[in-house]
């Protein structure tokens, strides 16, 4: 670590479709990153975020969310990803330096996993210059506090951070979450815990669409079961359990009420093979 163990800097070179996974070594700290050219996609393993970034984007992943994210290059040419790991203690020390109540709320809010700014290139160039200097210059703690608090305050005021986890509605968020662990016995408490939101908020949004929670979970699992059927590699019993149903009989009941045909018949229509 550099700068009294407050920072760690790395640059990763990525070819098209290469994926950089933000590991869980520093989950109690923050990660800030940007790419030098082209485009890449930031992906949440729970599917709550899938967002294309470019060389104007700066992303700050907040503590306890780092391990959920990965970055995939979509560029034909190689790109470089600059990543800074910033200690939680350093971020906390900035509170008295940052200008603007909005930036303070956004930076320290536990309800937002990340902040994203689409900046002008000169702002990114200044950040890159300071970060590149870590290897040769022994910056004082005071300089780093003044620089980063000033940088955060400036970009928030000029560009306004984007909370990209807010782009999806409740149904999409729940759907993506269930798909990420299809066999889990999802309950309201699990969903609300993962999404960091109140049950009444989610329930109200589902009710406004005439959708019941258990029906939504089952429809997601039925959709997944059909994708397994299309491969022609699984029997009904395997499909039922791999789709998250507790029993084959319950799977068959839900499937027939949804598709108006028994799963064995549907499998035959897809593959032409009758299950014995």
From Swiss-Prot:
One of its GO terms (cellular component) is cytoplasm. Residues 172-269 form the HTH araC/xylS-type domain. Keywords: Activator, Cytoplasm, DNA-binding, Transcription, Transcription regulation, Virulence. It is found in: Cytoplasm. One of its GO terms (molecular function) is DNA-binding transcription activator activity. Its main location: cytoplasm. Pfam families: HTH_AraC (PF00165), ToxT_N (PF22404). Gene3D superfamilies: 2.60.120.810, Homeodomain-like, ToxT, HTH1 motif. Residues 189-210, 236-259 bind DNA. SMART domains: HTH_ARAC. GO terms for biological process: positive regulation of DNA-templated transcription. Probable regulatory protein for the tcp operon. This is TCP pilus virulence regulatory protein. It comes from Vibrio cholerae serotype O1 (strain ATCC 39541 / Classical Ogawa 395 / O395). The gene is tcpN.
